[in-house]
């Protein structure tokens, strides 16, 4: 099991983290309108998969807003932000924060943990048990993993520059 920290305290992650060059595993998540989507729904596009515990935390909110700003203008790239929030909370967050880019989709895994388990970000213990650790994956148009960042301390932001560079390189 992979370990990360939450405020300096170790937590275990469940699942196998895909490596660059691996075929990305499919997953299911729920949009704000309660419809289900999967990775296959974004076939043929470069994807930035952003795993966050909850949009109601300050770091997750900052991260989602940052990816909305940094990736929204890149034609051919879709950002999928996956969290444990209910779709209603995601809708409220996006509305309040002015996040309405068609290139950024929020997805809830409240019904199904297939994303966090397939991508090795499922928190197995500690106070955030059942949520996803903070991570970023970039997939090319054929769903091959091109970039992976498992953020070692859950309360810190990822490397936006590296993720955006990987997405641009995958175009």
Curated annotation (Swiss-Prot):
GO terms assigned for molecular function: thioredoxin peroxidase activity
HAMAP family for the chain: Tpx
Highest classification ranks of the organism: Bacteria, Pseudomonadati, Spirochaetota, Spirochaetia, Leptospirales
Residues the record marks as active site: 60
Miscellaneous field: The active site is a conserved redox-active cysteine residue, the peroxidatic cysteine (C(P)), which makes the nucleophilic attack on the peroxide substrate. The peroxide oxidizes the C(P)-SH to cysteine sulfenic acid (C(P)-SOH), which then reacts with another cysteine residue, the resolving cysteine (C(R)), to form a disulfide bridge. The disulfide is subsequently reduced by an appropriate electron donor to complete the catalytic cycle. In this atypical 2-Cys peroxiredoxin, C(R) is present in the same subunit to form an intramolecular disulfide.
Assembly information from the UniProt record: Homodimer.
The family this protein is said to belong to: Belongs to the peroxiredoxin family. Tpx subfamily.
Organism: Leptospira interrogans serogroup Icterohaemorrhagiae serovar Lai (strain 56601)
Reaction equation(s) it catalyzes: a hydroperoxide + [thioredoxin]-dithiol = an alcohol + [thioredoxin]-disulfide + H2O
InterPro entries, A to Z: Redoxin, Thioredoxin-like_sf, Thioredoxin_domain, TPX, Tpx_CS, Tpx_Peroxidase_subfamily
Official protein name in the record: Thiol peroxidase
NCBIfam families found in the cross-reference section: PRK00522.1
Gene3D superfamilies the UniProt entry points to: Glutaredoxin
Entry function: Thiol-specific peroxidase that catalyzes the reduction of hydrogen peroxide and organic hydroperoxides to water and alcohols, respectively. Plays a role in cell protection against oxidative stress by detoxifying peroxides.
Enzyme class, UniProt record, top EC level: oxidoreductase
EC number per UniProt: 1.11.1.24
Domain of life: Bacteria
UniProt entry keywords in alphabetical sequence: Antioxidant, Disulfide bond, Oxidoreductase, Peroxidase, Redox-active center
Disulfide bonds: 60-94
Thioredoxin domain boundaries: 18-169
């Amino acid at each position: 099991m992979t370990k990360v920290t939450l405020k300096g305290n170790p937590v275990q992650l469940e699942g196998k983290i895909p490596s660059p060059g691996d075929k990305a595993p499919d997953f299911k998540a729920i949009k704000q309108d309660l419809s289900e989507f999967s990775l296959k729904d974004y076939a043929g596009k470069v994807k930035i998969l952003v795993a966050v515990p909850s949009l109601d935390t300050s770091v997750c909110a900052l991260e989602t807003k940052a990816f909305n700003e940094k990736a929204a203008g890149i034609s051919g790239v879709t950002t999928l932000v996956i969290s444990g929030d209910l779709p209603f909370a995601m809708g409220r967050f996006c509305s309040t924060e002015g996040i309405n880019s068609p290139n950024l989709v929020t997805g809830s895994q409240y019904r199904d943990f297939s994303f966090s388990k397939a991508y090795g970000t499922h928190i197995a213990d500690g106070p955030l048990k059942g949520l996803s650790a903070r991570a970023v994956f970039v997939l090319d148009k054929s769903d091959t993993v091109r970039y992976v960042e498992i953020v070692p301390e859950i309360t810190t932001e990822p490397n936006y520059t590296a993720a955006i560079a990987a997405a641009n390189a995958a175009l």
